[in-house]
Design a protein with these regions (language model features):
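Pepsin/retropepsin-fold aspartyl endopeptidases
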Residues: 1-155
Length: 155
């Protein structure tokens, strides 16, 4: 099974990205998420900006006392696991929909709640981290010179 990826520019370099659908049934909200597949990130996250743009109150889907301190983009953030029920679906190269849910899906909020902290957290992309790759036994193929990338799980 292969999940096709796109190769896009991020911070001056080519990176692999995957698009998936994330649904929050309680809110009747569906998000089309473009996530950076980041082998340098331990955690899978959904961008604060994407949640806010769809009208999801972030404080209502997290426990404010349960967070992990994390460095991303040179700044410290608080990573909150999403407690609200959600579903994630990907499209395979054969146009089949598959459900691959992370063990935890985080949203990153600023460590220092000031204007700069919020701006930095708002600018972070959604990320598919190593936790997701391990949990679903996925391998990443990435050839930036040919603009080719995919996630693959041997069946």
């Amino acid at each position: 099974m292969k999940i096709p990826l796109k190769v896009e520019k991020l911070h001056g370099g080519l990176k692999p990205f995957v698009t998936f659908i994330c649904e929050f049934p309680r809110y009747h909200k569906r998000l089309f998420v473009n996530a950076f597949v980041d082998t340098g990130s331990n955690h899978t996250s959904i961008a604060l900006s994407q949640l806010l743009k769809r009208g999801i109150n972030v404080k209502s889907i997290i426990d404010e006392n349960d967070f992990t301190e994390i460095m991303i983009g040179g700044a410290k953030h608080k990573g909150y696991p999403i407690k609200e029920r959600f579903d994630i679906r990907f499209l395979t190269q054969n146009n089949k929909t598959i459900h691959l849910k992370p063990e935890k899906l985080y949203v990153y909020l600023p460590y220092h709640e000031n204007k700069e902290g919020w701006a930095m957290s708002y600018s972070l992309p959604s990320i598919i981290g190593v936790d997701f790759l391990i949990h679903h036994n996925l391998s990443l193929y990435f050839n930036p010179s040919k603009q080719m990338a995919w996630l693959e799980r041997e069946e």
